[in-house]
């Protein structure tokens, strides 16, 4: 297994098998009615949610509020015991913090007339139903195909509910949907558990999925029943991209405006329900990536789609470097009969002039469009281009216009936790949901007949859902973040979210390596960070500053990161000294790239080498000599 969590769950499974607590699935029979017409059903599970001691509906297994997945192991709830924080947030996208326990209760009634939902509140007064999802999981086989029918209802049958339902790693099926008192809402969708590769965040490597997840959140929300069928294969919509595309795992309390979430996550709300969406994106990637690409290449099949969206992290090679990597994606799709969708990157919100947000990444849009057009001209019929870049910019400016020209209005779709500055690159859950809808609109607007036909199986069957805008109840409280953001402070002695562990220079005196540690801290890591190295001469006079070209990424979670590209106009010479600090960055795109944000938010303590006068010559893995200053931090 890849980590201790998996070992823990395996141990719990062994115990459950000995005690006989596991309920095995019913083998499908000729009388089994498939959830989706035409499916061949191999196995089936039916769960009825209610209080202990009540009777389950005929043919269903009773799930009670104390059915804990970790101890029951075959199925049950996540996040319901003191040790839940050790599970992390990679199973269903939600993660308990130390000291948090989700409290569940049944609503009353028998059979399918009962339900289970989150109740109570945490020590900061955050309501359980709103901020602590009811998180159900079924042990499942990776690489297998599942259909799900979930029925939600109101926990208190005398009151209305506002419910959001998620699957897998916080993929929305529907959000903020009103369910009237005592009524139900049933939805059917598809899930393909798939290992996910993590290159930038820890623990690293290929991490098993192994679950079908169904979670609900929202005022008075509850799960009434879930039916799951393991079936033969069906189409999959694969997603590759960077931090603006990847799944955005979060820590509780859950609030849609305080978590990084990529556009790929939001797609599940609109994709045809007979497609499963698998997001293999990760923060910090660009189109040259191979690890995540190979995860898809080794699994994609005829009839599948591959969505590829890159651009933000091509800071050193630009659109030319981006487009030079696209052939491998097309060849992988073409060889198996799948369809490639090249998607231009979402825009940033950091360039506001003349009353409107401006393009910073349109060079990638132009390059991607030309690449696809050239392929089509050469005879390709299994590729399409979708201009999300322009549609995202139009969305930002519409929000601004609709709010009287207020440029801060769109920040509600990018602002995350309090205290770390406004992120200008990464959408939150609300932003991802709306930007995914812009993809839907852009895909429907494709006019080239070849590309339009390639997209037709998806575009002609989009689910009829629309995005939810941030409510005026939130925006009326002031600029983001405001008092609507839930209060929750994790005790920590760390002042800064980033620690610089090492800085290295090559023989020419050029900075070429930095190692940093991202950690929980009193200051929130709210946006990209930029390493700034200040060089002084032997008299203590400043010679200039060296700036990292690559960001310290705030979207990949805690752990170490390595930065290898820096500006070279200032060099460290014999007798010089230096210090380094991580500041909040502004990502300008184009030739400008990262700069220090005017807000001047400091993300690290000042890094001071132990010996500012002497250096040691090292060789890196390629045999290049380096100046290696050791830190005393």
Give residue spans per PLM region.
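Surface-exposed, low-complexity/disordered Ser/Thr/Gly/Pro/Asn-rich loops and linkers
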Residues: 77-140
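Catalytic His-Asp segment of secreted/periplasmic serine-dependent ester chemistry enzymes
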Residues: 350-481
